[in-house]
Amino acid sequence: MKTKLTFLLSLTFLFLFSGSVFADDFQDAVDAYKRKDYKTAYKLFLPLAEQGDADAQYSLGLMYANGEGVPQDYKEAVKWFRLSAEQGIAEGQNNLGLMYSKGQGVPQDYKEAVKWYRLSAEQGDAQAQYNLGVMYGDGKGVLQNFIQAHRWYNIAGANGEDLGRKNRDIVEKKMSPAQIAEAQKLAREWMEEHGKE
């Protein structure tokens, strides 16, 4: 029994220590990235990402998309964004949507872009909310719908995306007072449901 307990305690300390090491490695990678020491950041992010760390996967996606410390490679960016997006990282979902919208690393597919923007927007990502507004306003991947465009621009603006407010005001000029009221109602309901004022 004593051996079993010692083994379990050792195992517990190993997991606690390794979790701490992974957290330290991630923070070291973030710090290196902020210093623009991309080669070090990449070396630290890669093993974490390969072990399934969604934040590290997202970070590698950014590095490949922007060519930071690695040659710019949109296919590789999509791979890492997708892995993080599938784990629920809102920024990964938004950036994966952006890749589909632009056709970078994947064939252009507006419907797929809308899918990922929506998942991210529902989590409160202001850029995704704005991007979803653009898709509705332009009728890309969805039927053109100024009410929905206004709704998502309004929500994005309330979450700090200045372009959301600007585009809301532009699209408003194409809408009737009843449509504007409906869009405002939908935005208000979404914000109340998601704990926003």
Spans of model-derived segments:
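Short helix-capping/linker turns of helical repeat alpha-solenoids
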Residues: 32-37, 45, 50-53, 66-68, ...
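Terminal, low-structured helical/coil segments at or just beyond the last alpha-helical repeat
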Residues: 28, 161-197
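Hydrophobic face of amphipathic alpha-helices that form TPR/SEL1-like repeat modules
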Residues: 25-32, 44-48, 59-66, 95-102, ...
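Bacterial N-terminal signal peptides that target proteins for export
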Residues: 1-9
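Cleavable N-terminal signal peptides
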Residues: 10-11, 21
